[in-house]
């Protein structure tokens, strides 16, 4: 049995920098994550970045990463730091 059959979920955390606050970025991240069936959260950080944490199948996390790089229309993503993260259970994807 493959590892993916035993443990289908992983967790990732992204720190997104650029013009990502006040432009609907967290709403965009939430819509994308819900569309992909992921759980977690998106929140603004004091330093101007947005933190996105998501749990789900690796293929869906990769899809979300691509969407986060594009961002919503008014955003200007200048860089993303991606990290593997410990899995924390959430029942939905929320904006904090």
From Swiss-Prot:
Q: Which reaction does it catalyse?
A: an acyl phosphate + H2O = a carboxylate + phosphate + H(+)
Q: Where is the active site?
A: 26, 44
- Which parts form a coiled-coil structure per UniProt? none
Q: Which GO molecular function, any one, fits this protein according to its record? A: acylphosphatase activity
Q: Where is the Acylphosphatase-like domain?
A: 11-96
The protein's superkingdom reads Bacteria
PANTHER family reported in the protein's UniProt record: ACYLPHOSPHATASE
The Swiss-Prot or TrEMBL record describes its family as follows:
Belongs to the acylphosphatase family.
Q: What is this protein called?
A: Acylphosphatase
């Amino acid at each position: 049995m493959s590892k993916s059959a035993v443990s289908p979920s992983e967790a990732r955390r992204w720190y997104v920098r650029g013009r990502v606050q006040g432009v609907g970025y967290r709403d965009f991240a939430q819509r994308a994550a819900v569309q992909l069936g992921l759980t977690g959260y998106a929140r603004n950080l004091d330093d101007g970045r947005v933190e996105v944490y998501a749990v789900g199948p690796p293929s869906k996390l990769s899809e979300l990463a691509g969407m986060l790089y594009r961002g919503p229309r008014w955003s200007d993503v200048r860089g993303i730091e991606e990290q593997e993260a410990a899995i924390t259970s959430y029942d939905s994807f929320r904006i904090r």
